[in-house]
Amino acid sequence: MTTPVVTRFAPSPTGFLHIGGGRTALFNWLYARKHGGRMLLRIEDTDRARSTPEAIDAILDGLKWLGIEWDDDVVYQFSRVARHREIAEQLLAEGKAYRCYATTEELSEMREKARAEGRAKLYDGRWRDRDASEAPQGVKPTIRLKAPLTGETVIEDQVQGRIVWQNENLDDLVLLRGDGTPTYMLAVVVDDHDMGVTHIIRGDDHLINAARQKQIYDTLGWALPTMAHIPLIHGPDGSKLSKRHGALGVDAYRAMGYLPAALRNYLVRLGWSHGDQEIFSTQEMIDAFDLPAIGRSAARFDFAKLENLNGHYIRHCDDAALMTLFENALDFVPGGADLKPKLNDVTRAQLLRAMPGLKERAKTLIELIEGARFIFADRPLPIEAKAAALLTPETRALIDRLRAALESVTSWNAETTEAAMRTFAEQNNLKLGAIAQPLRIALTGRTTSPGIFDVLAALGKETCLARLGDQGSR
């Protein structure tokens, strides 16, 4: 019988869900879903100063916004400290760990000596076999693992391949600090084991941790989960993604107007590939995803590519679904709060009618919202400077005549208003472009907009006639 797949995402609360963490969570979620398993969420909150409720909520909110749903209740590492201590004491009682009374000064000397001699191993093992009766007064001991002194520690990694460490270069790592708090290395192993984790998918900056954690697994006689260490995300210049490259948190991408589905699609392709396919539905991701298809090289974050992909998702999004995304984004994007009070049955209907034209011109929700501002504008419309310069007395007189021609349209839609304007143009020996721009300025306050007949249809007859009247010569 095959053991059900259990993955986990285990972030530390930093105040936001890092974009790299979002990709790690996505990979864990996809792998679990592909194999009919579960993805668990563990918050590694042992740093009490940083682990505020707000910092934890930022991670949970980021995952929910990305559409990554975890299974079961969230596990909080700090709540399991007693269990971590229990395992350390068990290893001590079995002679597989020992108390180390080395002082801070002694440890510093050991590190300096090891570095001077070019040795990877920093701790010299001086308390490994000494009797506790020799312990100095006033020193609170740590508990260290009795790591193997010879041989190799080997990880068969699903991404990195076979990785070998010489045990002579690995320290007897600390399991329990002098104040009784467990170290990260011990806590992670105990938690993963107790949670039934079968696959650990995480960044390759944890590779050295894998060697140390395997030694704990081996000492306890526990089965090592399958490991997959994925390459980190780098900036466009090839260096590690940092603040200077721009947004780091998932929340920042929401504020920049990216769609969750687009960001998921972009993140899954950072380091993983499936032939030449670029666009994936969620189900296609689940069906195609596999660990060996993840490359070993760092993936470069390309903001232009993300923006183009986001534009694709906006253009192909159902209008009603895009309406929901539009409204939800108002709480997060710059200037969104100004529009929110203006959402009502009338403006929602106008927005829905305008959506086919608006979404063709937008790569982000911010651009979509900016393009739609004319719908929510109060009368008389604010006219941008470039457009105002075109509102000559002659243009205003033309707007009066256009309004009169449109007033006679009974069944109001893009086709009927276009027919009326074409007839007007022919009767007055004008090109259609000569009347489209005055209409656009009067109806939107701008020189650019969706197709003018789409604008007429979206706003409706009453609003259009009122706005045209505002900009006419009367």
Swiss-Prot record:
<dbReference type="InterPro" id="IPR020751">
    <property type="entry name" value="aa-tRNA-synth_I_codon-bd_sub2"/>
</dbReference>
<comment type="subunit">
    <text>Monomer.</text>
</comment>
<dbReference type="Pfam" id="PF00749">
    <property type="entry name" value="tRNA-synt_1c"/>
</dbReference>
<keyword id="KW-0547">Nucleotide-binding</keyword>
<keyword id="KW-0963">Cytoplasm</keyword>
<dbReference type="GO" id="GO:0004818">
    <property type="term" value="F:glutamate-tRNA ligase activity"/>
</dbReference>
<dbReference type="InterPro" id="IPR049940">
    <property type="entry name" value="GluQ/Sye"/>
</dbReference>
<keyword id="KW-0030">Aminoacyl-tRNA synthetase</keyword>
<dbReference type="InterPro" id="IPR004527">
    <property type="entry name" value="Glu-tRNA-ligase_bac/mito"/>
</dbReference>
<comment type="similarity">
    <text>Belongs to the class-I aminoacyl-tRNA synthetase family. Glutamate--tRNA ligase type 1 subfamily.</text>
</comment>
<keyword id="KW-0436">Ligase</keyword>
<dbReference type="InterPro" id="IPR000924">
    <property type="entry name" value="Glu/Gln-tRNA-synth"/>
</dbReference>
<keyword id="KW-0648">Protein biosynthesis</keyword>
<feature type="short sequence motif" description="'HIGH' region">
    <location>
        <begin position="11"/>
        <end position="21"/>
    </location>
</feature>
<comment type="function">
    <text>Catalyzes the attachment of glutamate to tRNA(Glu) in a two-step reaction: glutamate is first activated by ATP to form Glu-AMP and then transferred to the acceptor end of tRNA(Glu).</text>
</comment>
<dbReference type="GO" id="GO:0008270">
    <property type="term" value="F:zinc ion binding"/>
</dbReference>
<dbReference type="Pfam" id="PF19269">
    <property type="entry name" value="Anticodon_2"/>
</dbReference>
<feature type="binding site">
    <location>
        <position position="243"/>
    </location>
    <ligand>
        <name>ATP</name>
    </ligand>
</feature>
<dbReference type="InterPro" id="IPR014729">
    <property type="entry name" value="Rossmann-like_a/b/a_fold"/>
</dbReference>
<dbReference type="GO" id="GO:0000049">
    <property type="term" value="F:tRNA binding"/>
</dbReference>
<dbReference type="InterPro" id="IPR020058">
    <property type="entry name" value="Glu/Gln-tRNA-synth_Ib_cat-dom"/>
</dbReference>
<dbReference type="InterPro" id="IPR045462">
    <property type="entry name" value="aa-tRNA-synth_I_cd-bd"/>
</dbReference>
<dbReference type="InterPro" id="IPR001412">
    <property type="entry name" value="aa-tRNA-synth_I_CS"/>
</dbReference>
<protein>
    <recommendedName>
        <fullName>Glutamate--tRNA ligase</fullName>
        <ecNumber>6.1.1.17</ecNumber>
    </recommendedName>
</protein>
<dbReference type="GO" id="GO:0006424">
    <property type="term" value="P:glutamyl-tRNA aminoacylation"/>
</dbReference>
<dbReference type="InterPro" id="IPR008925">
    <property type="entry name" value="aa_tRNA-synth_I_cd-bd_sf"/>
</dbReference>
<feature type="short sequence motif" description="'KMSKS' region">
    <location>
        <begin position="240"/>
        <end position="244"/>
    </location>
</feature>
<dbReference type="GO" id="GO:0005829">
    <property type="term" value="C:cytosol"/>
</dbReference>
<keyword id="KW-0067">ATP-binding</keyword>
<dbReference type="GO" id="GO:0005524">
    <property type="term" value="F:ATP binding"/>
</dbReference>
<dbReference type="InterPro" id="IPR033910">
    <property type="entry name" value="GluRS_core"/>
</dbReference>
